[in-house]
Amino acid sequence: DSHDVHTAYVSHISHVTSFALALTVLETEKDEKHIFDLASGGFSSTVRMAKSSAEMWTPILEQNRDNVLHVIDTYLEKMRLFRDAIADYDGGRITELIHEANRIKKILR
């Protein structure tokens, strides 16, 4: 169903990404004070969805499993592009990727 595909792209991946980032930070930053002191508005906005209910999101992710898995794979490919550009000290490629991502501004004003 096309609705499920689009929902996986614009809603479900945002929640999964937020949950994963929160887990990454919580695992690395054992001292909660560091998280609080260093957290910027961008971080807070990004992990805001990690406060969402597991009881609500588990069935949603299970019901739309195939689409969510496809979107996660696509997301990981994009993360790999950033990782490779950063590892290669390729500022031009990093800039290119960011400019490409900035096109979202035309959609989300």
Q: Which ranges hold each PLM region?
A:
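Short alpha-helical scaffolding segments that buttress acidic/His motifs in well-ordered protein cores
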Residues: 10, 17, 98-101
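Amphipathic alpha-helical coiled-coil segments
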Residues: 107-109
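N-terminal glycine-rich phosphate-binding loop for ADP-containing cofactors
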Residues: 17, 21-33, 60
